[in-house]
Swiss-Prot record:
It comes from Salmonella typhi. This is Carnitinyl-CoA dehydratase. Belongs to the enoyl-CoA hydratase/isomerase family. InterPro entries: Carnitinyl_CoA_dehydratase, ClpP/crotonase-like_dom_sf, Enoyl-CoA_hyd/isom_CS, Enoyl-CoA_hydra/iso, Enoyl-CoA_hydra_C. Keywords: Lyase.
Length: 261
């Protein structure tokens, strides 16, 4: 694993800290290491939730390492099987990822956060996609994911002028889940992670699968698709041990014990 990444396991929760000099910028080597971490998280049955954050209090990540670019790393370089920053192109991840944004999330750093399922950010966090000002485009998900979250006028301004969005504005638009003080950031992210651990893993996997499959469908078509039998997790969860455990635990007034099957 790269020395720029610090991995910490807390039971079923994996914390990934990106810690590189010069604004936690990401080059191809670091991106490969991040991809390895996320793919291992995906495939580890003992892990349920991942938290990705940046080292320090100023930068979550400034995105692509422009020093590496100046030294010849191409915008379309191979950044690994998970895409840029290791997460932006993993499309079969059925476990939740929380981005704990501790500061500036610019370019690929913002795209990394957008690839997560939840964003918890510090009050000093700021978001931007300044690629057009550098002669490139935010093609690691920014130009694809942001239009699903914001009105066209706001998206156009952000991607074409690189204008920054504050943490509070991001909260108003619903891009982030929580805004907390810098000192409370990781505590808040861990609290959310524990809430996710308390939910049944198969149910969460089914929800993520349904979101991916039906997000562009009309509601009626989505209903038919869900019930067509083509999904992997949805039919399984309906007949799982966990589906029996949930109601039984509720009736017995105790916490459910999920088995993931």
């Amino acid at each position: 694993m790269s020395e720029s990444l610090h991995l910490t396991r807390n039971g079923p929760i994996l914390e990934i800290t990106l810690d590189r000099p010069k604004a936690n910028a990401i080059d191809a080597k670091t991106s490969f290491a991040m991809g390895e971490a996320f793919l291992n998280f995906r495939d580890d049955p003992e892990l349920r939730v991942a938290i990705i954050t940046g080292g320090g209090e100023k930068f979550f990540s400034a995105g692509w390492d422009l020093k590496a670019a100046a030294e010849g790393e191409a915008p379309d370089a191979d950044f690994g099987p998970g895409g840029f920053a290791g997460l932006t192109e993993i499309f079969d991840l059925d476990k939740p990822v929380i981005a704990a944004v501790n500061g500036y999330a610019f370019g690929g750093g913002f795209e990394l956060a957008l690839a997560a399922d939840f964003i918890v950010c510090a009050e000093n966090a700021s978001f931007a996609l300044p690629e057009a000002k550098l002669g490139i485009v935010p093609d690691s998900g920014g130009v694809l994911r942001l239009p699903k979250l914001l009105p066209p006028a706001i998206v156009n301004e952000m991607v074409m002028t690189g204008r920054r969005m504050s943490a509070e504005e991001a909260l108003r638009w619903g891009i982030v889940n929580r805004v907390v003080s810098q000192s409370e950031l990781m505590e808040s992210a861990r609290e959310l992670a524990q809430q996710l651990v308390n939910s049944a893993p198969l149910a969460i996997a089914a929800l993520k699968e349904i979101y991916r499959a039906t997000s562009e469908m009309p509601v009626e078509e989505g209903y038919r698709y869900i019930r067509s039998g083509v999904l992997k997790h949805y039919p399984s969860v309906l007949h799982s041990e966990d589906a029996l455990e949930g109601p039984q635990a509720f009736a017995e007034k105790r916490a459910p014990v999920w088995k993931g099957r």
